[in-house]
Each structure stands twice: as structure tokens, then as C-alpha cells.
């Protein structure tokens, strides 16, 4: 039995993991090089909770690396007969999974390929709040052609006009208490169901929900934080990050 077969048949929960904190992401079609920055920076952050990845179409190197790192793998995200793109459908999978979990107090929903950690992401986060994270505050949503298009496609021009002056909130990372995250996911999935085939519907729905949904009491972080989303970095900045991660990996060997 190879590593891929083993990983499909077993859920590994690290024996030292604190069960009350959980980080959830999706990794579809990634190589080990695409996953390592996320995993290695998290391992070096001091985080002691669970990490669950919904995965499929990983190469053998990525599977071997994730098994070695004792990551919980769930092989199902792209197996359902669903027309919604995987980056939207993952939230339905997350919601189904979390509804069955017990003893969870704090949750982080996150992208994988473009996120690195600079510390424990839950430091300073309570278990009765919802935390969202802005992109460059100098660029408003209406000034970004991509975010404008995602909102326009899902909601139309009237909603886009109302939200165009707001800062852009990144849907790639959301942190909160168990009930706060479940409430957020319920609302997000309902919004994306308006038109399930729209690309990047999660980003458009996320910004509208945070901007207008009264029941979502959220805290927006615009300053330095313990994680970093690589959305629009220069080549020199990425080279510096790559060098730091290479040293991080060498230290673990």
C-alpha cells in the first residue's frame, strides 16, 4: 500500500495537538513545494492545535510530506457532483465537517498556497468573536478591477456602488469562535448559492457580508499580524521569504 492509499484510509491527529483550536484549509493539485511554506511556517509558529486539510490530486511528494508532518487529511472535496468551483465549494465541506466536531473553541479558515505564518494565529483571538483581515487599505474595493468584478457578478451594480468605497477584506483568512465561524459559513454558503457557477464568489460574498451583515460582528485587522497573505508582493520580498523558509526547513532536518 503506497502513501496515497494509506492517507485515504487513515485520519492522523497528532498526539500532542490541543483539540480546542483547529485550522482548516484546502489543498487541491498542489506539489510539496507549494505546501511547504504554509506547513513549515505553522510548525515554527508555536501553534499546538489541529490542522485539517481537505485534499485531492496531490502528487506523491506532497502526500509523503503531509503524512510525515502528521497533518489530518480528508480526501473528498472534489469528489462530489457539484458545478461550483472548488474554491467556493470548500466552504460547504468545511461547514459539514465542523458541525460534527466537538470540543472546538476557535477556528481558522485559511488558504494554503499563499499564506505563511509569523506566529501563532490565535494569539489575542477570543472564542466569541469573528476576525477578518484587510488587504492594502490604500486601495478601495471599487478601485480594484478584480474585486469589483467579483462583487458585480454576484450582486449587481447597485451593491457594488454601495461597497466600492470600503477597504478590501481578504476571504483567504477568517478566524473566530466555533459558533461565530459556523454562523459565518452558513451565511457565506447561502450567498454563494445565488449563482454557484460564478468564479471567486467567496471573495465577493465575503466583502458584502462583512460590509452589510449586521449579525456578523467582526473585527478587521489592518496592521501587522502573525500571518501573511502573499497577494501582491514584489520579487525581492518573495525571495527574502523563500530564503527564510529554506532556513526554517533546514532547521527541522
What kind of feature is each model-predicted range?
Residues 1-89, 96-104, 179:
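N-terminal anchoring/stem segment of glycosyltransferases
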Residues 32-35, 91, 114, 171, ...:
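Generic preference for well-ordered alpha-helical elements
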Residues 52-54, 106-111, 131-133, 175, ...:
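A structural signal for short, well-ordered beta-strand segments and their strand-loop junctions
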Residues 61-63, 115-119, 124-125, 139-142, ...:
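Short catalytic/ligand-binding loop motif for oxyanion handling, primarily in non-cytosolic enzymes
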Residues 70-91, 234-252:
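Active-site donor-binding segments of glycosyltransferases and PAPS-dependent sulfotransferases
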Residues 93-146:
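GT-A fold catalytic core of metal-dependent nucleotide-sugar glycosyltransferases
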Residues 148-165:
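Short, flexible, basic/aromatic active-site loop/helix in glycosyltransferases
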Residues 162-253:
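Catalytic core and acceptor-binding pocket of nucleotide-sugar-dependent glycosyltransferases
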Amino acid at each position: 500500500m503506497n502513501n496515497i492509499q494509506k492517507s485515504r484510509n487513515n485520519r492522523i491527529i497528532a498526539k500532542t495537538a490541543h483539540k480546542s483550536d483547529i485550522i482548516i484549509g484546502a489543498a487541491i493539485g498542489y506539489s510539496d513545494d507549494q505546501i511547504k511554506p504554509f506547513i513549515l511556517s505553522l510548525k515554527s509558529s508555536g501553534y499546538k492545535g489541529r490542522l485539517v486539510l481537505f485534499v485531492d490530486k496531490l502528487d506523491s511528494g506532497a502526500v509523503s510530506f503531509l503524512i510525515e508532518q502528521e497533518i489530518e487529511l480528508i480526501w473528498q472535496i472534489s469528489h462530489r457532483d457539484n458545478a461550483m468551483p472548488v474554491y467556493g465549494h470548500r466552504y460547504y465541506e468545511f461547514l459539514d465537517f465542523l458541525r460534527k466536531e466537538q470540543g472546538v473553541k476557535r477556528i481558522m479558515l485559511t488558504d494554503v498556497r499563499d499564506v505563511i505564518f509569523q506566529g501563532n494565529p490565535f494569539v489575542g483571538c477570543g472564542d466569541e468573536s469573528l476576525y477578518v483581515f484587510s488587504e492594502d487599505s490604500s486601495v478601495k474595493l471599487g478601485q480594484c478591477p478584480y474585486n469589483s468584478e467579483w462583487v458585480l457578478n454576484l450582486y449587481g451594480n447597485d451593491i457594488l456602488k454601495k461597497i466600492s468605497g470600503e477597504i478590501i477584506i481578504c476571504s483567504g483568512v477568517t478566524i473566530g469562535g466555533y459558533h461565530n465561524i459556523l454562523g459565518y459559513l452558513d451565511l457565506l454558503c447561502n450567498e454563494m448559492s445565488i449563482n454557484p457557477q460564478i468564479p471567486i464568489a467567496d471573495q465577493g460574498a465575503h466583502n458584502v457580508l462583512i460590509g452589510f451583515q449586521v449579525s456578523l460582528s467582526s473585527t478587521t485587522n489592518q496592521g501587522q499580524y502573525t500571518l501573511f497573505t502573499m497577494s501582491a508582493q514584489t520579487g525581492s520580498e518573495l525571495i527574502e521569504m523563500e530564503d527564510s523558509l529554506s532556513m526554517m526547513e533546514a532547521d527541522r532536518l
